[in-house]
Structure formats: structure tokens, C-alpha cells
From Swiss-Prot:
The gene is mraZ. It comes from Salmonella typhi. Residues 5-52, 81-124 form the SpoVT-AbrB domain. Pfam families: MraZ. This is Transcriptional regulator MraZ. Forms oligomers. GO terms for cellular component: cytoplasm; nucleoid.
Length: 152
């Protein structure tokens, strides 16, 4: 399980160094193989250990290519999916097209989200956190049954 937000830097080649606390788990669970794709709702990237990504691919394969909405989701997620192999120094090369989608330059936030990571431009991340907190403080929606059972 991945959790927490960590500031990391992209080098001039577009590589990020995976924090040490995640490396062993990524090597054990995925032999360092990561799949990176775009988030279709936010300007960030999603990084999945390969076994987790394969579950997503299976779900995507069950969608109908004849349904325009389902086809669009397949196209966006699969069309942007890029395999990244963690090197011996614990670095991942993020493809230029993916960096461009998320507006990644130098300082980025690696955010653990259970079975995957989100990768955000640092400034965009803090803006999103502020928007999320503001939305929660002024929320008028009723919590779903699952959220009502969540006690923090």
C-alpha cells in the first residue's frame, strides 16, 4: 500500500527518483515495472505497479469499443500508458508526452493512493489540495453510505 505525499525532483532527462521507502515494495511486487498513464479527470499522472495495471487493463478490455464513452476512456488510458522500468538507482523515466499532460517540470509531488501513485506538478498539487479542503468545508452534498461509515 502506498500512502503519503513526497516532494521529488525530475532531472533534466525527465527521471524521478522513487523514495527509498517504496523501492523494495515495487521491486518485490512488480520487479520495478511501473505503468504510467494520464488521469482523465485531473492534470496529473497515475503510476501503477505492473500487476495492478494488468487488473485495470482487464477491466478496460471488457468495455465496449462500440460505446463512444467507453471507447474514449480506453483510448485515453491505454493510449497514454507507458511502461517505466525502475533502474538500479531507483529512477523512473517519465515520457515527455506524459510530463506535458501534467505540466511537470522540476519539482513534483508523488502521492500514494493505496495501489498506485499520483504524480503532480508541485504548485498544481497544492492548489488541488486547497480546492478539495474548501469543497469539503462548504459541502452541501450528503455523504455516501460508505463515507458515513468512515470514522477518522
Amino acid at each position: 500500500m502506498f500512502r503519503g505525499a513526497t516532494l521529488v525532483n525530475l532531472d533534466s532527462k525527465g527521471r524521478l527518483t522513487v523514495p527509498t521507502r517504496y523501492r523494495e515494495q515495487l521491486i518485490e511486487s512488480a520487479t520495478g515495472q511501473i505503468v504510467c498513464t494520464i488521469d482523465i479527470h485531473h492534470p496529473c499522472l497515475l503510476l501503477y505497479p505492473l500487476p495492478e495495471w494488468e487488473i485495470i487493463e482487464q477491466k478496460l478490455s471488457r468495455l465496449s469499443s462500440m460505446n463512444p464513452v467507453e471507447r474514449r476512456v480506453q483510448r485515453l488510458l491505454l493510449g497514454h500508458a507507458s511502461e517505466c522500468q525502475m533502474d538500479g538507482a531507483g529512477r523512473l523515466l517519465i515520457a515527455p508526452v506524459l510530463r506535458q499532460h501534467a505540466g511537470l517540470t522540476k519539482e513534483v509531488m508523488l502521492v500514494g493512493q493505496f495501489n498506485k501513485f499520483e504524480l503532480w506538478d508541485e504548485t498544481t498539487w497544492y492548489q488541488q489540495v486547497k480546492e478539495d479542503i474548501d469543497a469539503e468545508q462548504s459541502a452541501t452534498e450528503t455523504l455516501s453510505e460508505r463515507l458515513q461509515d468512515l470514522s477518522l
